[in-house]
């Protein structure tokens, strides 16, 4: 609410005001005016209503809002008026007989802390109507007598609030700010009514935070805001020197009001209503920032005062900044005063206590009031505090001198908005009201009335900087607040703005404060008895007068925006808090109080730094460790490779899982198992699936296998017979050197081979059980096929009988068909890649040139930036003289294309001969699965004729013959082939457009050549025409012997691998990403016993096939038995 706005429910109770000109009327006349203004005061029937009116008036008093400077020039006159009024205020009709009053009411009121004379007079005036009426009367009387003001406020609340335990309040010695207007007498609560009003309701803990704030409706509150919180009113007006205090620098860009005029509240306190204060209060009243009361949660004493819901903590509000003399104190009355972000440090306790004892200049020792420092520094201009002046006069000794705010009022720093930030445990400071309550009894009688020692947790403004008595000890209970000392006993959470009080020139203790000012140590002054010996204000300790207000040089910086978001900059915070902490031993008491604040805050300091620091400390051990991690940093391309292949394999695994489940269901249906048996089988499959997922993550290495013998050596790998260490099972292990795969650009081919071997779920393809890799090599662990390959058999036999050729070609047709059904093209069907198992049936192997037309099978996918390397399907310079290449002439394309084709001829690539490769593959004109049927025709020719149809001296000539197959293909008559065999060869070895098999393998199966083959039955179940001879499980006699010179030696392997791979790494390449998703483990791996244990050759031979193919059903039923598994396999 803007200052000039009138809150809802505003009542025109604006008392008479004094003229702006110098006041020259006599004291008697002034007293008359004041009395007239008092008659106009509203008289609410009950305290709550009065409080409500108070809140309205206090927050709405237009005089306070709009004419704050009006009395700025009347300090001297007001002081004179005060002096003249003091005798009247002190007059008590104690002579009246108590017989005229209700003894019970008298006793209750006295118990509440009211002076006997005051109570008797009130009861007499109200005809013993009710305690509330008496309290209301006392409230009016308190306008005339400052000491009564505090007692009325302190005592009335407990009574009206049914003496709620939470209503423990401390009387605040407050000097009435007799500005000559009843406005100054009326509690100036300009905030929203009760609920929102900063004015503390009688039940509100804040009401006590308005230390001495009178009952609502009573003018006491007005005085409370402006007067000492000791409950004692300093009757003798302070000398006019009070004016000497220069106004503090205007907040945030406001020009300082002329001296002697009370500037309107700072812009940051929109709702603060400047109150009229007595001349004494003209002194800068320490700006009360929303400092959380004493120890509440987190060490702050719980808000002892029963915070009435009417007075919710004003979290958004900020305390009042110190206002210099001549400047109206900023009254934080409206709960909307300071809508500090609740996140503000000051709001950490949830109460943005704008209520903070705005009236408190001095906080009792027990009170730990955290008041965020004003955004601007207090200047030494506030030469003498009203208390200092008063000490010189009849006023009670001020707890702070020279305009310096009492330690309780002092704010450690902007960051110390919460009690936890302040050292609630300050030695001298009594955080617990109960302690301070005992102090009140000891405190010098400030108001002559002993204010009940309700002991709310008194949050004292910890002026860690200003507080010369850094230890709250300075606020000892014995110490008596000066007349101007407003000892605000703020209930733990000050939920309502405290009544306005003179705020000392704001201390630049914000988080952005330039530097921690060198505070002048302030001598601890002994407490002087207040001029009016009134009962000791409970819990009201007098702050010794501050020697001198801190002097800042230059105006403070404006609040930065980030402060409003609870991010006070860390450096200022440290500059303020740390110096006091480090210099603690030598610092004056004010710094000691800051130390106490530091002590309390120490536990939360780091956390606070984390929350308030805008700068994140990056350099820590964890970060360094993270940087030093051994995990390699891969390129984005590597991530692309991994994710593309990983996602594909994850989806594939899911599909395979569904397939296995369906397969099991079909098998159980076919077998006709009972329901219980089916359920058991399903459970077993589920368990096996779970185990499989776990096993797939198990790392494998070559140490798990023992090499027995080398079976063959290829272009960049070798095949050897190996035994698995744990299961003793025999496997054929194919090892590929990564360096050769990379250099020959065979990554795509290896990936394609791995895929087809892993996906192959039929008996025509060698089964892959495991694939894994290490730093240097890739490993395929496959079925060991002891019968050797077709080439070895061809070499031994020379020419096959047509019946044997028919049998093998029929099985080869079925094998190629199975590969095509899986979506692959072998592209390298030749006798070397056809293996014969122990029962004489064939299996396809070596899918190094196989492709599935997948992006992972494309060599270009694995090439980055360099010029493209040629794969094994390109022409090799070993084929002949490159100058004889006629690719350009033959293709007749653009010259660039011809040049590229010629480069292919020059490129190193294919190892071996192109005898079995279809012409479209060599020409790269585009090919389909039909290219494999070409190879079948060539193999049939070789079986029956004894040599390939396109045999030549060099690979290049062979390639030329293949390309010119129309003229080079001749079936020699001496071979004496049957017309069916010749016709089949001719129909398979022709152009793809009319090649047999174009419409599927059935075309081939229907050819007359296979008229004696029953493709409808499983060929593998038929007896083979040739059964290889196997003498023992590790018999390798069916394989051609390996040249010892070509054998891999471990030493050479290490040297070659290291040299080659080091070269790759030196060039900045990371080829390892080419082998992502290479690892594989078969679901049905025969438990590691593809052939069981070695048995007699005959027995093994008979049951070999069954043992190779696993049956999930049998596997689950027989447990360790591994034979006859042919139902479920992958």
From Swiss-Prot:
Span(s) of short sequence motif PPxY motif 1: 373-376
Gene Ontology BP term (one): negative regulation of canonical Wnt signaling pathway
GO function terms (MF aspect): ATP binding; magnesium ion binding; nuclear estrogen receptor binding; protein kinase binding; protein serine kinase activity; protein serine/threonine kinase activity
UniProt PTM comment: Autophosphorylated and phosphorylated during M-phase of the cell cycle. Phosphorylated by STK3/MST2 at Ser-909 and Thr-1079, which results in its activation. Phosphorylated by MAP4Ks; in parallel to STK3/MST2 and resulting to its activation. Phosphorylation at Ser-464 by NUAK1 and NUAK2 leads to decreased protein level and is required to regulate cellular senescence and cellular ploidy.
Tissue: Expressed in all adult tissues examined except for lung and kidney.
List of residues binding ATP: 711-719, 734
Enzyme Commission designation: 2.7.11.1
GO cellular component: centrosome; cytoplasm; cytosol; glutamatergic synapse; microtubule organizing center; midbody; nucleus; postsynapse
Disulfide bonds: none
Record field: compositional bias (Pro residues): 235-268, 300-312
Top-tier EC class: transferase
Residue ranges of coiled coil: none
UniProt feature, compositional bias: Polar residues: 19-30, 167-179, 381-405, 454-482
Biased composition (Low complexity): 434-447
Region of interest (Interaction with YAP1), ranges: 526-655
Short motif (PPxY motif 2): ranges: 556-559
Effect upon mutating residue 734 to A: Loss of kinase activity, autophosphorylation, increased ploidy, prolonged duration of mitosis and lack of p53 expression
InterPro entries linked: AGC-kinase_C (IPR000961), Kinase-like_dom_sf (IPR011009), LATS1-like_MobB (IPR049761), LATS1_STKc (IPR042706), Pkinase_C (IPR017892), Prot_kinase_dom (IPR000719), Ser/Thr_kinase_AS (IPR008271), Ser_Thr_kinase_AGC (IPR050236)
All copies of domain UBA, residue ranges: 100-141
SMART domains, per database record: S_TKc
Assembly and binders: Complexes with CDK1 in early mitosis. LATS1-associated CDK1 has no mitotic cyclin partner and no apparent kinase activity. Binds phosphorylated ZYX, locating this protein to the mitotic spindle and suggesting a role for actin regulatory proteins during mitosis. Binds to and colocalizes with LIMK1 at the actomyosin contractile ring during cytokinesis. Interacts (via PPxY motif 2) with YAP1 (via WW domains). Interacts with MOB1A and MOB1B. Interacts with LIMD1, WTIP and AJUBA.
Stated name of the protein: Serine/threonine-protein kinase LATS1
Species: Homo sapiens (Human)
């Amino acid at each position: 609410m803007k200052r000039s706005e009138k809150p809802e429910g505003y009542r025109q109770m604006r008392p008479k005001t004094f003229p702006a000109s110098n006041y020259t009327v006599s004291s008697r006349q002034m007293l008359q005016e004041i009395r007239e203004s008092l008659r106009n005061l509203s008289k609410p029937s009950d305290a709550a209503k009065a409080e409500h009116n108070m809140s309205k008036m206090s927050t709405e008093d237009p005089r306070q809002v709009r004419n704050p400077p009006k009395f700025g020039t009347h300090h001297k006159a007001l002081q004179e008026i005060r002096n003249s009024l003091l005798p009247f205020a002190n007059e008590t009709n104690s002579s009246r007989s108590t017989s005229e009053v209700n003894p019970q009411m008298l006793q209750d009121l006295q118990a509440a802390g009211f002076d006997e004379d005051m109570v008797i007079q009130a009861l007499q005036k109200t005809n013993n109507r009710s305690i509330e009426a008496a309290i209301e009367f006392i409230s009016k009387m308190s306008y005339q007598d400052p000491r009564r003001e505090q007692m009325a406020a302190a005592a009335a609340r407990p009574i009206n609030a049914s003496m709620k335990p939470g209503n423990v309040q401390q009387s605040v010695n407050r000097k009435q700010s007799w500005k000559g207007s009843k406005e100054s007498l009326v509690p100036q609560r300009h905030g929203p009514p009760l609920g929102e009003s900063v004015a503390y309701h009688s039940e509100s803990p804040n009401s006590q935070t308005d230390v001495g704030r009178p009952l609502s409706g009573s003018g006491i509150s007005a005085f409370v805001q402006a007067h000492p919180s000791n409950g004692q009113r300093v009757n003798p007006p302070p000398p006019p020197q009070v004016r000497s205090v220069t106004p503090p620098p205007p907040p945030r860009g406001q020009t300082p009001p002329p001296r002697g005029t009370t500037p309107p509240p700072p812009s940051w306190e929109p709702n603060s209503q400047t109150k009229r204060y007595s001349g004494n209060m003209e002194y800068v009243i320490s700006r009360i920032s929303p400092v959380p009361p004493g120890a509440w949660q987190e060490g702050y004493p719980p808000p002892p005062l029963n915070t009435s819901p009417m007075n919710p903590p004003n979290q958004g509000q900020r305390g009042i900044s110190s206002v210099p003399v001549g400047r109206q104190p900023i009254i934080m009355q409206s709960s909307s005063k300071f809508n500090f972000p609740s996140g503000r440090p000051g709001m950490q306790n949830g109460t943005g206590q704008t209520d903070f004892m705005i009236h408190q200049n001095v906080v009792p020792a027990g009170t730990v009031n955290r008041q965020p420092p004003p955004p601007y520094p207090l200047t030494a201009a506030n030469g003498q505090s009203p208390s200092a002046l008063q000490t010189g006069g009849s006023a009670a000794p001020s707890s702070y001198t020279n305009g310096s705010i009492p330690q309780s009022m002092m704010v450690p720093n902007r960051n110390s908005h919460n009690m936890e930030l302040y050292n609630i445990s300050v030695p001298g400071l009594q955080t617990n009201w109960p302690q301070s309550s005992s102090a009140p009894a000891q405190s010098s009688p400030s108001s002559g009335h002993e204010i009940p020692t309700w002991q709310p947790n008194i949050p004292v403004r910890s002026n860690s900087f200003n507080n010369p008595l850094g230890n709250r000890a300075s606020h000892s209970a014995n110490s008596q607040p000066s007349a101007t000392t407003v000892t605000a006993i703020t209930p733990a959470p000050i939920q309502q703005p405290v009544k306005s009080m003179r705020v000392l020139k704001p201390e630049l203790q914000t988080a952005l404060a330039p530097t921690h000012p060198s505070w002048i140590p302030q001598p601890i002054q002994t407490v002087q008895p207040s001029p009016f010996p009134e009962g000791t204000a409970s819990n009201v300790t007098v702050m010794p007068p501050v020697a001198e207000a801190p002097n800042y040089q230059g105006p403070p910086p404006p609040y930065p925006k980030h402060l409003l978001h609870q991010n006070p900059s860390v450096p200022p915070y440290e500059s303020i808090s740390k110096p006091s902490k480090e210099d603690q031993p030598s610092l004056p008491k004010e710094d000691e109080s800051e130390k106490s604040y530091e002590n309390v805050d120490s536990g939360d300091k780091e956390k606070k730094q984390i929350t308030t620091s805008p700068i994140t400390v990056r350099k820590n051990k964890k970060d360094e460790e993270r940087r030093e991690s051994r995990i390699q940093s891969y390129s984005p391309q590597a991530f692309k490779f991994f994710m593309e292949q990983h996602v594909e394999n994850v989806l594939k695994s899911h599909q395979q899982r569904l397939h296995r489940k369906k397969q099991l269901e079909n098998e159980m249906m076919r077998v006709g198992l009972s329901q219980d048996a089916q359920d058991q089988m399903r459970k077993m499959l589920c368990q096996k699936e779970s185990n499989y997922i776990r096993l797939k993550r198990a790392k494998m290495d070559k140490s798990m296998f023992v090499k027995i013998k080398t079976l063959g050596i290829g272009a960049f790998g070798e095949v050897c017979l190996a035994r698995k260490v744990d299961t003793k099972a025999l496997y054929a292990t194919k090892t590929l050197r990564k360096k050769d795969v990379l250099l020959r650009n065979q990554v795509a081919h290896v990936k394609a081979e791995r895929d087809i071997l892993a996906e192959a779920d039929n008996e025509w393809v060698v089964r892959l059980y495991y694939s894994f890799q290490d730093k240097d090599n890739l490993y395929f662990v496959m079925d060991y096929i002891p019968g050797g390959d077709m080439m070895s058999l061809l070499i031994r036999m020379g020419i096959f009988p047509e019946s044997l050729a028919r049998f093998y070609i029929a099985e080869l047709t079925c094998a190629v068909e199975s590969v095509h059904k899986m979506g692959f093209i072998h592209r390298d069907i030749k006798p070397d890649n056809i293996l014969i198992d122990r029962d004489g049936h064939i299996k396809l192997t070596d899918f190094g040139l196989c492709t599935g037309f997948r992006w992972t099978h494309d060599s270009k996918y694995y090439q980055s930036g360099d010029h493209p390397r040629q794969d094994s399907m390109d022409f090799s310079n070993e084929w002949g003289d490159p100058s004889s290449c006629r690719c350009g002439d033959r293709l007749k394309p653009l010259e660039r294309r011809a040049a590229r084709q010629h480069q292919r001829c020059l490129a190193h690539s294919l190892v071996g001969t192109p005898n079995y490769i279809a012409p479209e593959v060599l020409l790269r004109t585009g090919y389909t699965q039909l290219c494999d049927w070409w190879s079948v025709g060539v193999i049939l020719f070789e079986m029956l004729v004894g040599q390939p149809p396109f045999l030549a001296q060099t690979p290049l000539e062979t390639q030329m013959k293949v390309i010119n197959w129309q003229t080079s293909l001749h079936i020699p008559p001496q071979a004496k082939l049957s017309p069916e065999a010749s016709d089949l060869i001719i129909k398979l070895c022709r152009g793809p457009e009319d090649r047999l098999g174009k419409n599927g393998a059935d075309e081939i199966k229907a050819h007359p050549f296979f008229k004696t083959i029953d493709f409808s039955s499983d060929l593998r179940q038929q007896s083979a025409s040739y059964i290889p001879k196997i003498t023992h499980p590790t018999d390798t006699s069916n394989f051609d012997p390996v040249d010892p010179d070509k054998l891999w030696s471990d030493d050479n392997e290490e040297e070659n691998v290291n040299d080659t791979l080091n070269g790759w790494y030196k060039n900045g390449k990371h080829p390892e990403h080419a082998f992502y998703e290479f690892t594989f483990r078969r679901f049905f791996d025969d438990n590691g016993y593809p052939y069981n244990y070695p048995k007699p050759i005959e027995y093994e031979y008979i049951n070999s096939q069954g043992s190779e193919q696993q049956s999930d059903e049998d596997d689950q039923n027989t447990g360790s038995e591994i034979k006859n598994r042919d139902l479920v396999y992958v």
